[in-house]
Every structure is written in structure tokens, then in C-alpha cells.
Amino acid sequence: MRYLRFKRWLTELNQTTDGIDAVYFEEVRRHAGVDAAHAYGGFMAHLTAWCEHHQIPYQGVPVGTIKKHATGKGNAGKADMIAAMQALGHQPEDDNEADALALLYLAIEQGGMA
């Protein structure tokens, strides 16, 4: 059911905003375990299929690229990512929010799909 809820959430987000013009997502190339890899693969499959169905461009960005753009180091730690976003005036609740903000800044700076 988690994948159906995810697709429903994407559709609701698309309908309750001015629409989604592009999707950037963190491209994880290494997983801690088999379950994590399966879950990630399932979400990525549904995300890319949903984007293609709605003709929305999408791009995965490697974790190291996001970290390097935000901190100058491709292997930056969680505290480094949080500090980088705080330096930009944000107060991320955790490293996941900091990573999402860093990805947003990267996407904006690229000016669209690379």
C-alpha cells in the first residue's frame, strides 16, 4: 500500500499546487541492506513512471553531488549539511530536511534539467 499512497500523494500535490514542472530526487547508489534497496527501487519505479505518465521531467542527483554542492565536500557528514543550510538562513529539523534543501538549491542553480 505504501506505493499506492505515494502515487496518490504525488497526484494530490500536483493538483493542489500550480502543478509540478520538474522532479529532482536523491539518487542513492548504496544501501545499508536488501530491504532498503527494495524499498528505494519501488519508490523510484513509481516516481519515474508517474512523472513519465504526466510528462514531467525528472532527474536523480547522486548523494555526493548534493553534498559537494552544499559544502564543497562530497563526503560531508550530517552535521556539515545541517550547518550549510543554517548558513543560508534555514533551520532544518534534521539531516534529511537539510539534504532536501541542498537538493533544492542545486536544482535552482542549475536552472532546470541538466
Per-segment meaning from a language model:
Residues M1-A114:
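Phosphate- and other anionic-substrate recognition elements at nucleic-acid/protein interfaces
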